[in-house]
Regions:
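An active-site metal/cofactor-coordinating segment within enzyme catalytic domains
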Residues: 1-51, 103-120
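Conserved, mostly hydrophobic/aromatic
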Residues: 21, 45, 57, 89, ...
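Second-shell loop/turn segments in exported
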Residues: 31-35, 54-60, 82
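C-terminal active-site rim and adjoining tail of enzyme catalytic domains
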Residues: 32-36, 108-110, 115-178
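A structural motif corresponding to the C-terminal end of an alpha-helix
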Residues: 44-54, 76, 133
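Structural preference for beta-strand elements that scaffold enzyme active sites
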Residues: 54-56, 82-85, 102-106, 136-139, ...
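Active-site-adjacent beta->alpha loops and helix N-cap segments on the catalytic face
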Residues: 63-66, 90-95, 142-152
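Distinct, well-ordered alpha-helical segments
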Residues: 64-76, 92-102, 116-124
Length: 178
């Protein structure tokens, strides 16, 4: 992942130092009033979370982040219910839940129909993944197969959707219990 979309310079995050990343202006692309805004550290972000509010942390790298993330979570004043991990990588979710079982973690997955018109991943694959990773639920795009959603939630898992920007989609997801 890079800083191309947000910053005044394009750096590859995983190949950059914190010092280099902190020098970037990540505000000007929105509006000049935000000029000079810097990338915060995770501890600074945690410190800005108000009581009774939550933060969803999307892990885009691999397992190597877990020890550092757990350390920063431990140093924060946030309660377990305030920090939720989301990730496509099943092994990251599993490792996070092994270390911090009291925190919620959701498996990120999109749904597509195959050539035969069947949803992928299948209901069995979703339920097996949630159980194997000890995830608390699923977080998906707005393209939600209703029957799979109902069965997953009936099995006791939560389901959330990302990037819903219109009222009709929001109401459809709400009607499903998402």
């Amino acid at each position: 992942h890079s800083t191309k979309r947000l910053a005044n310079r394009n750096l590859v995050v995983g190949e950059s130092t914190l010092k280099e990343l902190r020098e970037l202006d990540v505000g000007s692309h929105k509006d000049l009033s935000w000029k000079g805004t810097r990338i915060p550290t995770i501890s600074e972000v945690f410190a800005a979370i108000p009581d009774k509010k939550k933060i969803f942390i999307e892990v885009k790298c691999g397992m190597e982040i877990i020890p550092y993330l757990v350390k920063e979570i431990g140093k924060s004043n946030l309660k377990p219910e305030q920090i939720i991990l989301i990730c496509f990588d099943q092994e990251v979710i599993k490792a996070f839940k092994q270390v911090l079982p009291q925190n919620k973690a959701y498996w990120l997955s999109g749904f597509k129909k195959d050539k035969a018109g069947d949803w992928r991943p299948t209901l069995d694959k979703v339920l097996m993944t949630l159980k194997d990773t000890n995830a608390d639920g699923l977080d998906s795009s707005k393209n939600v197969p209703s029957e799979i959603a109902r069965k997953v939630m009936r099995a006791g898992y939560e389901w959330h959707a990302w990037t819903v920007n219109d009222v009709t989609t929001a109401k459809n997801l709400q009607a499903l219990g998402i």
